[in-house]
Amino acid sequence: MAFIATLSTGSGTATIRLAGELDAATAPEFHDAIDDAVATGAARLVIDASELTYIASAGLRALVFARQKVAEDVTISLVGVTEPVLKVIKMAGLDHGFDITAS
């Protein structure tokens, strides 16, 4: 499956839907979606990872990038996180910087 990062907005929320594998080759597309989401000025960023099948270290760095790019008062939620992806996020210690809902 090809990687897809799709941004949608509404009601003060920017949602980025991720599908496929998030790695060094695909992280720039996620970075672009984050930049676009920040530009909307949304008070909440939702990252829908329900179709994300794999996350590599570059994907983890992209999550850190997201946390750094948004304003401090912007809530970032990771939703639909699959068990394999959640395991990697937890091993990296990134589960404390985000509101995470597993699938």
PLM region descriptions:
Residues 1-17:
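Short beta-strand/loop segment at the start of cytosolic alpha/beta domains
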Residues 24-97:
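Amphipathic alpha-helical interaction surfaces in cytosolic regulatory modules
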Residues 99-103:
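Short acidic-hydrophobic, aromatic-tinged amphipathic segments that line or gate anion-handling sites
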